[in-house]
Amino acid sequence: MPKMKTHRGAAKRFRKTGTGKLKRGKAFRSHILTKKSSKTKRHLRKAGYVSDSQLKVMKKLLPYL
């Protein structure tokens, strides 16, 4: 059986934490920021985590992460 391939786009966007969760950056942070409040932009700086329902799909995309 051939080696499993890592999805390179996903590998650039996710990092594994010590407990096995997947950490991700948040969207809506690159441009058109003038209409967003300071509070919204501050919350977008914080890391997000992949939900438990999506974790199984992500493990297939990132078998060696």
Swiss-Prot record:
GO molecular function: structural constituent of ribosome
Keywords: Ribonucleoprotein, Ribosomal protein
GO biological process: translation
Region (Disordered) residue spans: 1-26
Record GO cellular component, one term: cytosolic large ribosomal subunit
Record InterPro entries: Ribosomal_bL35, Ribosomal_bL35-like, Ribosomal_bL35_CS, Ribosomal_bL35_sf
Source organism superkingdom: Bacteria
Xref: Pfam families: Ribosomal_L35p (PF01632)
HAMAP family assigned to the protein according to its UniProt record, in alphabetical order: Ribosomal_bL35 (MF_00514)
PANTHER family given in the database record: 54S RIBOSOMAL PROTEIN BL35M (PTHR33343), LARGE RIBOSOMAL SUBUNIT PROTEIN BL35M (PTHR33343:SF1)
Family (UniProt): Belongs to the bacterial ribosomal protein bL35 family.
Name the UniProt record assigns to this protein: Large ribosomal subunit protein bL35
Organism the protein comes from: Clostridium beijerinckii (strain ATCC 51743 / NCIMB 8052) (Clostridium acetobutylicum)
Gene transcribed to yield this protein: rpmI
